Amino acid sequence: MKAFMGDDFLLDSKTAVKLYREYAENMPIIDYHCHLSPKEIYENKTFATITEAWLYGDHYKWRIMRANGIEERCITGNASDEEKFFAWAKTVPMAIGNPLYSWTHLELQRWFGIYDVLNEKTAAATWKKTNELLQGDGFGARDLILKSNVKVICTTDDPADALTYHELLKESDFPVQVLPGFRPDKGLDISSPGFADWVRSLESASGIAVTTYQSYLDALESRVRLFHNAGGRVSDHALDQMVYAETTEEEAARIFAAGLSGEHVSFEDEKKFKTRTLQYLCGLYAELDWAMQFHINALRNTNTNKFSSLGPDTGYDSINDERIAKPLARLLNSAEKKRQLPKTILYSLNPNDNYIIASMINSFQDGKTPGKIQFGTAWWFNDTKDGMLQQMKALSNMGLFSRFIGMLTDSRSFLSYPRHEYFRRLVCTLIGGWAEQGEAPYDMELLGKIVEGICYRNAEEYFRF
């Protein structure tokens, strides 16, 4: 029997251990998609309590606390930080089998040197020690990033954001690149009641009067170029439902005018507007050699009562099951026909889409850029041991696992970087298993190079930050 969360955690063979220790463990991190705050990084934010560092904004934890019968007052409500932490400690023993159980203990070990199992009995001592350390030196946001050996962070930013803190960080002595990620979702959601207000914010940020569809595209382009000048090389699109509908520029202009004036926009018109705008952005991204990310098939805000009282991103989303193959292929093909398909990373929240994406990406590789079209790492509800292995196996079965750009945190917490360790251990177990079973040669130079690529070097070459 192995020790709980011991040195060989998730490593199931001698080859896996060797690959991890000699090739994966000490590789730097490129966190090319996350939700960290550039302001908090610039200010080297510190945390008064482990609750603030660990539980604020973490809807992963909130979901299972609710499932454990914890009242909302101790989750997002007005309970004290101590009460909220003890409520989490009460929940943790019930979470065996959930990745949060592993992540919780991995983070306690790596950041705080705590190897006890977290439960109601150990909660008081854990509360005391973590808070003492957090209130001392070396636990600010920048410190945590540096301790994690992070080289690049890409945040998630609205096109209308000023990027003030990215510029301040660029001018500072902080050695980690903190770069903006272009997330124009509000600009594509033309049926949203807030669309017109968002266009006004885009107008203000760009200095371009937005009165027509063309001026809207001009304003978007001006912000893309501003992000580019700030070091940005990635965009991200939440395409909860993958759509594709051809339209003309004239029809897109009509639909835009309707949305801007607050008129009802039909679903068919929304599809046309999104398609035309994404096609335009594809060309712009390709020109600037950006990587475009699509996050597909999330079903958001499913509990309308809770959405009304708590708002979005509070733990009430789930997996969607919309069909993606035809609209995704048509969108990629429409860009490729014009030689305007940028580097692209595709994620789906529905694991049933794994082989659809893994097979599709090789229809659009260009024979020049290794892994130009990527099957992105297991995302959100799939960010588990099984989910990661399923994604990696689908990719290896359909294409080149060796060209995979690997892990990202997609996190709002500065304590979440041990998730890269979790991922890297699984990579080594998968590749080590192939060698142990005679499916790959026991060539440590070859296997080690692949491991280093997936952990860091492939992303370094792919993004060229």
Language model segments and positions:
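Residue-level detector of anion-binding/catalytic polar loops
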Residues: 291
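Catalytic core of soluble alpha/beta enzymes
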Residues: 243-258, 276, 294-356
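Metal-cofactor-binding active-site regions of metalloenzymes
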Residues: 1-288, 340-342, 346-351, 358, ...
